[in-house]
């Protein structure tokens, strides 16, 4: 029984330490507990009314009230739901700017990395040499290709395959492994040579008889250009027709395309 009274006495002493019997504190606590009302910032007692008392500035009253100094480390600061400090500032502007930056960045990436066409244009015959034996006509031709890169990224030409036909028969073919780099929005010229052997009696007469004034043969050239672009390999097919003088050697100068630095 004595132990029970002693425990009750100690609890009363602790309550006295935590909540001192101060009429000013009673009004303060009542005011502090009413912060959930519609006007939370004006519920605390103003600072000038507590002059000389053991109070500190209330952390949730924007400096307009005080709490007991003894409970400064025990009370938890409560911020009302409608407090301006809980409202993020410039949220709409920040979200708008973030979305705009993402859209602009995505649009620029799509614009610059979107694959565009690679133009391959046969310029024509640059030179040819002719040789004959008893039944065959040998034509060594050199032609020019214009390659235009319309992309904003560089490309690399890796292979060129050429096939030459005369009267629907394959008379020459060649395949080259290349490593030709073409910059963004740039053009390059490349030369390729093909050795052709024509085994046709009428063509042989056209090329060797002196009585015939026109010594031209028609060659059909078809080719495949392989290039890589952004780690992706693609092929382009081109074709052209060339009239070749099979009586003598010819050389046709072509104006080279100027390349940007």
Curated annotation (Swiss-Prot):
Intracellular or extracellular location(s): Cell membrane
One cellular component term (GO) for this entry is: plasma membrane
Query: Which Pfam families does its entry note?
Result: TMEM106, TMEM106_N
Provide the transmembrane region boundaries: 95-115
Q: A biological process (GO) annotation for this entry?
A: innate immune response
Q: Which UniProt keywords apply?
A: Cell membrane, Immunity, Innate immunity, Membrane, Transmembrane, Transmembrane helix
Record membrane topology: Single-pass membrane protein
Q: What does this protein do?
A: Activates macrophages and polarizes them into M1-like macrophages through the activation of the MAPK and NF-kappaB signaling pathway. Upon activation, up-regulates the expression of CD80, CD86, CD69 and MHC II on macrophages, and induces the release of pro-inflammatory cytokines such as TNF, IL1B, IL6, CCL2 and nitric oxide. May play a role in inhibition of proliferation and migration.
What is the protein name stated in its UniProt record?
Answer: Transmembrane protein 106A
State the organism's lineage: Eukaryota, Metazoa, Chordata, Craniata, Vertebrata
